[in-house]
From Swiss-Prot:
Domain of life per record: Eukaryota
Residues annotated with Phosphoserine modification: 90, 109, 207, 268, 328, 465, 643, 667, 736, 738, 745, 758, 766, 866, 898, 1036, 1051, 1056, 1059, 1114, 1154
Pfam family, one: KRAP_IP3R_bind
Coiled coil: 955-1031
Keyword Phosphoprotein found: yes
Keyword Ubl conjugation among record annotations: yes
Gene: Itprid2
Keywords, sorted A to Z: Coiled coil, Cytoplasm, Isopeptide bond, Phosphoprotein, Ubl conjugation
Annotated S-S bridges: none
Positions of region (Disordered): 28-70, 306-483, 552-575, 595-636, 1095-1131, 1147-1180
Protein name per Swiss-Prot or TrEMBL: Protein ITPRID2
Lineage: Eukaryota, Metazoa, Chordata, Craniata, Vertebrata
Compositional bias of kind Basic and acidic residues: 395-407, 415-428
Length: 1252
């Protein structure tokens, strides 16, 4: 539009246009109606009046839709309000706030509200014009707006009435023209060139994105068409077709052999195989020869026949392979062998036999020329061997296998295998010798026994083929053999066949042990292994398969990177493995029943589960050469395993390095069922296996190979030293993992933990050693041997890490593993006898009634030392601490430093200390009642009221305990942080600052020292109470009389009163328990035949975080389970009531990062170890694990207990003295180090290291 030069003209034109547009919009909305003409009695300029009249005169006005009532126009008002200020609003409008307020309150028509945008479509005024209008008319419009806006809330139809009839009027009166707003919002303007919306970078440079190049695509299509031309054979283009062709040819060849009618082979394999295939293909067999043919073919397929021997001489390898495949498939169908398994086996065998081609094709189609050659040889060999009697073939096999460098190198069976074959040539053994991939395949496929003998022959023939990878003995195959045969074979195999070295491919599923066929566990394990191993086998075979020219040496672990650590271990250089195997073979001869136990590195974790405990084939452990593989903590074990493996019972517990909490005992028991069956069959005793595991663990520290043969127990000191070294090496606290769930059921797993407790410092927990209890007979043997080799071993208290109920485990066992244990299920709780339950270490002196109650769960969470009966006499020691802020220990004058207001953290720490002291004081109030009361409570109804108190007190104490732990941790962390910061700044500090620093340091030291002092005093009290408790307990274990004090509100507190901080307490309890057990065992209780089998040390250190929660106490149910675990002596299991079961659950709270010099030296370990010779006795720095200690079942003999107590006292006193001395020395060191740390920066890193 042409703009008039004058402002007024400009405005006039603008408003005319605006009014016309609004009218047009109203009409299109069908909302224009006649309205009364109104005088614009406003103070607006005549121009505005004219404009208004023009709008009104047409007699049509936007009515306020009366029917709708006064619809509030707040939405539009808000929209206008939001838009107007920044968009060219005039100074006038900005200064006026009233219009805005009016606006918001005004109502308008619903149509206006909905159709504001329609008007925007007609706006084409340039911005500049609108802005000019706004500047000029702002005042006038505002006047109108004020006048009419006051009555706007009633949307009258006439302007004369002073009301605004429509939104358009309102907008017109508003100081800012809505057109301007809409323009600014982007309405009604010409769209800019769309190119302007595209960033220039897209035009400046071409895109690098790759699309479809039509030319390339077309050329590819043309090439594909050419390749797929039938003239080139489909196999050259599609691998699938190639495989299908091979299979079809195999079937056709099989059919031709069976039917005697030659068939045209599908697709000339010319592209892959030589033309002489046809010539080589054997003439169709007559029906009379069909059976022979099938046998030979199967043997070829299953046991890659030596490629050197070409029985068929020229049959194209593809045909041979196809034939073998077809035969195996047919047999599978008929013989009940699973076709897929056979195929897998055949593939593996072929790949192994045709070493030249390691590629998948070899295994899948086996159509490579080299394969064909090998196949020919194999077929010929198979034919020749098949013709011979199976047994003779087997014998040959044994000899040939011995000859075979592969087998020999494959440490697996050559030596052992030979013996095994000799003893039980039974088809299985010879086939087991075939350990080659075929063996694994045969294992996978439940081959008919018939296949196995032929396979043996073939294997013997396979001198040239490199099947080291599969060097697994046919033990794995045994499951395919009839159960009876399997049993006999298993025994012989156990004695002779050990797949010690060639375990590398065991993971491929060879883990299936024929020896274990007796036990379902093995079968299950085998199945799982097969599932796992199917892929593993293929990988293993391929990796192990090397050119035919290669030495027949099992590739080292390096050769087979794919293998799990366990596999790698088994792959240890064959030479080494061979030598070991030979040694093992000899040992095994001595221990015919023992089978090497497989140690699987954590890497093989998946295999671990699948391998199952009974997988003699996995003698990977034997390869001590790969300790690094087991570096996870298996190192000692694996090394020791070499000899142990041989000795290990056939059911090897796959020893897992995995750091999990022991699985529930139930899992062991489940395994035990299989184990018991094995025992029945004369399999090596589970005890042997346990011993083997234990020896393995200790191999590193003490080379007791000779003792191992005797299954001697390892000395606790040696173990402790070893563990200490391991811990020092930086092993983090780990969770112990239970043996595979499929372990022999008779097993009772008891774990002993060497705990090295440095007061106020990081505790170190040696990986707990686990003892597995099997049938009593076995235990007796172990006991005898153990006593001969190491008297202490018997004494070591075994820690039973049961899967306490899930509730309990919550914190300590939050880790899934423990929960798994729980899931495995717990045997029904068995009532504990008061004396047993009352043992100071066991809060569980709970009556069986309580066991099912939630309280019981809570009780379990109580620390093992939770029920120290602290005598009143000891109370005096704590009297000073009863006062929250009583003077620091007299020895520490640092209190004076507190002149400065303590920091918030220090205050918090003091509060925590106050809580601790109060709890201790509370305990001291009920010196003697606690122990007896607890024991009595379950038996007396009057004590029923104690339960709620007990729960409440327990919870409170737990809170205090956590706060204490938190306090210690925070304090240590705080100190470390402060020292680090101060050391940097200290040289630059002023004297005053340094003085403050020294004061704070002194304060912290005093706090720490006070805590240690409290622990020391608690220790003394506990010892005194323990004696008193025993005196009370022994005479009447069930004595129901409950002291009335027990009913007192706080009497129950005493149960958990012992300071959770007290690190020494658990140690002393362990020692006490050890000595007690020792005395009991020494007093002719050996006849009970319950010996503590050597624990298998699985590095399990419970993470400190987990440990923070209270330790889990074993409940009576554990005892019951334990007793049941003994397979051979179920009656004895029932006798639990007559046997004394000591349960100590030790809650070692995580200690805060220790300060400088926190790590205690091994000497302390030894001293603690000596006490009771218990492995637990050796504290390991940083132990925060919750270990549940469960000594062996012992008969309840009060008299004997008294005697033991006397014997025990001396040892306890000695140990206590040593501990005190070490603590005192440590405290001194800490004081000095603390002082130095504040001054010398060099010491700053020290504490950090100690904490780790």
């Amino acid at each position: 539009m042409n703009r008039p030069l004058s402002a007024e003209a400009e405005e006039e034109l603008e408003w005319q246009v605006a009014s016309r547009r609004r009218k047009a919009w109203a009409k299109c909305r069908s909302s224009w109606q006649a309205s009364e003409t109104e005088d614009l009695s406003t103070e607006t300029t005549t121009q505005d009046e004219d404009e208004d009249d023009e709008e009104d005169l047409p007699g049509t006005k936007l009515p306020a839709p009366a029917g709708r009532g006064n619809v509030p126009n707040e939405k539009i008002a808000i929209w206008l309000k939001d838009c107007r200020t920044p968009l060219g609003a005039s100074l006038d409008e900005q200064s006026s706030g009233t219009p805005k307020g009016v606006l918001v309150r005004n109502g308008g028509s619903f149509e206006d509200d909905l159709s504001l945008g329609a008007e925007a479509n007609h706006l084409h005024e340039p911005d500049a014009q609108v802005e000019n209008c706004n500047n000029i008319l702002a005042k006038e419009r505002r006047l109108q707006f004020h006048q009419k806006g006051r009555s706007m809330n009633s949307t009258g139809s006439g302007k004369s009435s002073g009301t605004v009839s429509s939104v358009s009027e309102l907008l017109e009166l508003y100081e800012e023209d809505p057109e301007e707003i809409l323009y600014n919002l982007g309405f009604g303007r010409d769209e800019p060139d769309i190119a302007s919306k595209i960033p220039s970078r897209f035009f400046n440079s071409s895109s690098f994105a790759r699309g479809i190049d039509i030319k390339v695509f077309l050329s590819a299509q043309m090439q594909r068409m050419e390749v797929e031309n039938p003239n080139y054979a489909l196999t050259s283009r599609f691998r699938q077709i190639e495989v299908l062709t091979t299979v079809a040819n195999a079937f056709s060849s099989l059919y031709s052999q069976v039917s005697g009618t030659p068939l045209q082979r599908i697709g000339s394999m010319s592209s892959v195989t030589s033309t002489k295939e046809v010539a080589d293909s054997p003439p169709p067999l007559t029906r009379s020869n069909t059976a022979n043919r099938l046998m030979k073919t199967l043997s070829k397929l299953n046991l890659c026949v030596d490629k050197t021997e070409k029985g068929e001489g020229g049959s194209s390898p593809a045909t041979e392979k196809g034939r073998t495949l077809s035969i195996s498939l047919s047999e599978d169908g008929g013989g009940g062998k699973s076709d897929p398994k056979l195929q897998k086996v055949v593939k593996k065998k072929e790949s192994s036999s045709m070493l030249a081609t390691v590629t998948e094709e070899v295994s899948g189609s086996s159509s490579t020329v080299t394969d064909s050659v090998d196949a020919d040889r194999l077929s010929e060999e198979a034919d020749s061997t098949i013709s011979h009697q199976e047994e003779s073939e087997e014998s040959r096999e044994a000899h040939s296998q011995e000859k075979d460098p592969l087998r020999k190198s494959a440490v697996t069976d050559p030596d052992l295998g030979h013996d095994g074959r000799v003893s039980s040539h039974c088809e299985l053994e010879s086939s087991s010798e075939l350990k080659s991939a075929q063996a694994s395949s045969s294992e996978k496929e439940p081959c008919a026994p018939l296949t196995i003998p032929s396979i043996r022959n073939i294997m013997t023939q396979q001198k040239d083929s490199f099947e080291m990878e599969e060097v697994q003995s046919t033990e794995g195959e045994a499951p395919h053999v009839p159960a009876t045969c399997q049993l006999s074979l298993a025994k012989s195999k156990r004695d002779h066949l050990l797949r010690t070295a060639s375990q590398h491919s065991d993971s491929s599923g060879f883990a299936e042990d024929s020896t274990d066929c007796v036990s379902l566990n093995h079968l299950l394990v085998n199945e799982s292994l097969q599932a796992m191993g199917s892929s593993a086998d293929s990988c293993d075979s391929e990796t192990t398969v090397t050119s035919l020219g290669e030495d027949h040496v099992t590739p080292t672990a390096q050769d087979q990177p794919y293998f799990n650590e366990s596999e790698e271990e088994s792959l240890a250089p064959l030479q080494k493995g061979r030598a070991k195997v030979e040694i093992v073979a000899e040992k095994r001869k001595a221990d015919n029943q023992d089978f090497p136990q497989c140690v699987t590195a954590e890497n093989a974790g998946n295999n671990e589960s699948t391998k199952g405990p009974c997988e003699p084939g996995h003698q990977i452990t034997e390869t001590g050469e790969h300790p690094p593989l087991a570096a996870t903590g298996e190192l000692p074990r694996e090394e020791s395993v070499e000899s142990d493996v041989e000795k290990g019972s056939e059911c090897e517990f796959a020893q897992y390095t995995t750091h999990h909490i022991l699985r529930s005992l139930a899992s062991f028991e489940a395994q035990g069922s299989g184990m018991s069956s094995e025992k029945k069959t004369g399999f090596p005793s589970s005890v042997d296996r346990v011993n083997t595991a234990l020896q393995r663990a200790q191999m590193k520290v003490c080379s007791m190979s000779g003792q191992r043969v005797g299954r001697s127990l390892i000395k606790s000191k040696d173990l402790l030293k070893q563990r200490y070294l391991l811990a020092k090496a930086g092993y983090p606290l780990r969770r112990s993992q239970s043996l595979p769930t499929t372990l022999l059921s008779p097993v009772r797993v008891v774990s002993s933990v060497n705990v090295r407790l440095s007061p106020g410092k990081e505790t170190r927990c040696s990986p707990p050693s686990f003892t597995y209890k099997y049938t009593p007979e076995e235990e007796q043997d172990l006991e005898k041997q153990g006593t001969e080799h190491d008297g202490q071993s018997l004494v070591k208290s075994t820690i039973f890490i049961p899967p306490p109920s899930v509730k309990k485990e919550e914190a300590p066992q939050s880790e899934g593993t423990r929960l798994e244990e729980c899931h495995h299920g717990r045997l029904a709780p068995c009532p504990q006898f008061a004396p047993i339950s009352q043992s100071t270490c066991s809060l569980h002196s709970v009556h069986s009634e309580w066991q099912d109650r939630p309280l019981c769960e809570h009780m379990r969470t109580l620390s093992a030392h939770s029920v120290p009966n602290i005598s009143g006499a000891a109370c005096s020691a704590f009297s000073p601490f009863g006062c929250p802020y009583s003077h620091r220990h007299a020895a520490h004058p640092y209190r004076a430093c507190s002149v400065n207001p303590p920091s918030a953290i220090e205050m918090q720490l003091r509060r925590v200390l106050h809580d601790i002291r109060s709890s201790l004081q509370n305990l001291s109030q009920y010196p003697m009642t606690r122990g007896p009361d607890l024991a009595a409570a379950p038996y007396s109804t009057q004590n029923s009221s104690v339960l709620p108190l007990y729960e409440n007190t327990f919870q409170e104490l737990q809170v205090v305990r956590r706060s204490l732990n938190l306090f210690r941790t925070q304090m240590m962390d705080l100190e470390l942080a402060m020292l680090r910061q101060q050391t940097v700044v200290y040289p630059h500090m002023t004297e005053e600052d340094r003085y403050e620093v020294d004061q704070l340091q002194g304060l912290r030291n005093s706090v720490r020292m006070e805590l240690q002092d409290l622990e020391m005093q608690l220790e003394e009290r506990l010892l005194g109470l323990d004696e008193q408790l025993r005196a009370v307990r022994v005479p009447s274990p069930f004595r129901p009389s409950a002291l009335p004090g027990m009913c007192g509100s706080r009497s129950v507190d005493n149960l958990s009163c012992p300071s959770p901080l007290n690190v020494m307490e658990p140690v002393t309890e362990l020692i006490r328990e050890q000595s007690y057990l020792k005395s009991e065992l020494g007093l002719g209780l050996g006849d009970m035949a319950y010996e503590i089998p050597p624990g298998e040390s699985s590095e399990s250190v419970f993470s400190q975080a987990t440990s923070e929660s209270s330790s889990v106490c074993s409940s009576p149910s554990h005892t019951n389970r334990r007793s049941r675990g003994l397979p051979g002596s179920k009656p004895r299991a029932r006798l639990v009531a007559r046997k004394k079961i000591f349960r100590a659950s030790v809650a070692l709270t995580p200690t805060a990062p220790s300060r400088t010099g926190s790590v205690q030296t091994p000497p302390d370990l030894e001293s603690s170890e000596e006490a009771g010779g218990a492995e637990e006795a050796s504290p390991v720095v940083g132990l925060a694990s919750h270990v549940e200690e469960e000594p062996e079942d012992l008969s309840l003999m009060p008299a004997a207990e008294e005697m033991h107590r006397n014997v025990e006292q001396d040892e306890l006193q000695q140990v206590i003295r040593e501990i005190k001395e070490s603590i005192v020395g440590e405290i001194r060191r800490e004081i000095v180090s603390g002082l130095l740390a504040a001054v010398s920066s060099s010491k700053a890193p020290g504490p950090k290291q100690d904490s780790h």
